[in-house]
Amino acid sequence: MALERRKANTIPVSWSQEDEKLLLSYLKKESFDAKFLKELFPNRTLPGIRSKVRKLRIKHDLFGESYRGQKEDFTSKVAQKIKPKSVFDAYAGAGHQTFKWIAIADIVYASEKMKSKLKQFEKTAKTNGFTKVDTGDCLWKLFKKENKQILFFIGDAVDAAADLKVNNLHIDLVDLDTCGSTLPILPTLLVLLKPKHIVITHGEFHSMRFKREDVLRRLFMHRDIGENPLPMNVDEMSKELDKAVKIAALRAHNETSDSFWLSLEDETWLGGRFHGMLRRYYKVSKPSATSDCINELSNS
């Protein structure tokens, strides 16, 4: 059955400063409650409220605040286990995970597409005792603390990774931490940076909960785009994402020998199984024979 284009059926209504302050005050204290917010703003559609919630959370660094401690604990756990010297934090945001990685690593390269996040990152850097060093017009902004260095790139993660590749900089670990999906970008980053470790946060669970069939069809490149992957429960989605990650890595290059095999080493739920996201740590190695890889994936 053909998909229908998603579109708004109502005229957009601008938010007053009073309503915005009311919503922000709620978000700073409570988790998202669709029923309550619809009662609080009866003249607004639920999609409109969700859109404003997302914008405010980004603007005020509230995304994932309820499970930020869980995420930081997992990051620190992985860092202590593998002790990476260099890390690429592809979606750094305000830098909460960046400064957990730098506690162990010597250098962290962080990228963030939203220019507004730089001030938040600078604030986090100052809180952690890092000083910003003037680098002029350089694409990378430098923060230092004793022998530790963080370089912050304002722009797309692929552009940042390409710059690291051109300058022949070694990366031990790549952190893909976003509220969306990083499945499409994964093969590119693997080929460019050739890390030994990958940590990935799966925001695709939001698409599953909101029944975004169109989004999941696009993201699950290992499946027939003409087939609806839904319905799926949490366990099925977890297995599907593991398979998607491993197949994306196996197909990253023309030759199997130049592609990658990812082994799931650890995982944690952020915010609970039925409301949050899954964060996973994979060890990266070279694939064995193509047939062995395909057999394992086919039987998983």
Q: Where are the regions a protein language model picked out?
A:
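Short, surface-exposed basic-aromatic patches at helix termini and helix-loop junctions that form
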Residues: 39-42, 101-107, 123-128, 144, ...
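S-adenosyl-L-methionine
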Residues: 2-6, 46-104, 110-168
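Structural alpha-beta junctions
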Residues: 2-4, 40, 46, 57-61, ...
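Class I S-adenosyl-L-methionine
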Residues: 157-173, 178-300
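Myb-family helix-turn-helix DNA-binding modules
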Residues: 2-61
